């Protein structure tokens, strides 16, 4: 059992995120939650993975459409701000990216207003994330045409969930 309690997070130290993430691409997924909690996020320079170089353009464009400002000029990574919070938006992914779908879900659940995400990925891990967010109080519906509708809520609550096994690592 893993228990994560982030209710008192006031700072996300860049060095800690960089050290804990290694060459993982996971830090980009911290952006939405950090923007909601702190009004800013710093994402260290991300590498690729076993697949090769993988741009994060869809992630950044999603955050921009939700109201964030993205500064890619920082020498050590990407600085993202949303001092006035995030807001709902209509977003279309030109490719059903798993990471960009996760990014949109994690950022939109606490955004002010409604978000419509079309062209989304619907892999089992995505549907499991939707189930987790719904257990936490998120309002999300998924249409058969891969369109997600997310109604922002003021807060999420704790939950108990058994995660799926990793299909790639299994």
PLM region spans:
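Structural preference for solvent-exposed beta-strand-turn elements
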Residues: 1-170
